[in-house]
Amino acid sequence: MDYVSLLNQIWQKYLNSPYTTCLYIPKPTAKYTPLVGTSLHPVLWNCQLSFAGYTESAVNSTKALAKQDAAQRIAWLLHKDGGIPDGCSLYLRHSSLFAQSEEEESFSN
């Protein structure tokens, strides 16, 4: 699943909703920082993605992969919290879309 596209779709749906009032949410924004990597990937990328009051960071070997990882974390937070305040809700049908989080792992042990 392309989580960056999912966040963009949520943002567009939110802007086009007739029930959206008084709360402007800017589109998802990403900031990249290069990091020292490994011998296999000499440069790693830290992506800090912000959307709807959430900010998540992820590190990966390419900017695109780091952005996808950060977008997945924000999508999970939106799902967990019930969506954007005063607007769209996000309920995913299949929990298998997300890897098992640390929070879920602690309950299974």
From Swiss-Prot:
Keyword terms of this UniProt record: Apoptosis, G0/G1 host cell cycle checkpoint dysregulation by virus, Host cytoplasm, Host-virus interaction, Inhibition of host innate immune response by virus, Inhibition of host NF-kappa-B by virus, Modulation of host cell apoptosis by virus, Modulation of host cell cycle by virus, Viral immunoevasion
Annotated compartments: Host cytoplasm
Cleavable signal peptide: none
Principal location listed in the UniProt entry: host cell
GO cellular component terms listed in the entry, alphabetical order: host cell cytoplasm
Magnesium among keywords: no
Tagged with keyword ATP-binding: no
GO biological process: symbiont-mediated perturbation of host apoptosis; symbiont-mediated perturbation of host cell cycle G0/G1 transition checkpoint; symbiont-mediated perturbation of host cell cycle progression; symbiont-mediated suppression of host innate immune response; symbiont-mediated suppression of host NF-kappaB cascade; symbiont-mediated suppression of host PKR/eIFalpha signaling; symbiont-mediated suppression of host type I interferon-mediated signaling pathway
Described purpose of this protein according to its UniProt entry: DsRNA-binding protein that plays a role in the inhibition of host innate response. Suppresses host PACT-induced activation of RIGI and MDA5 and thereby circumvents the production of type I interferons. Also prevents the activation of host NF-kappa-B. Inhibits the integrated stress response (ISR) in the infected cell by binding to dsRNA and inhibiting EIF2AK2-mediated phosphorylation of EIF2S1/eIF2-alpha. Stress granule formation is thus inhibited, which allows protein synthesis and viral replication.
Complex and partners: Interacts with host PRKRA/PACT.
Protein name, UniProt field: Non-structural protein ORF4a
Primary gene name: ORF4a
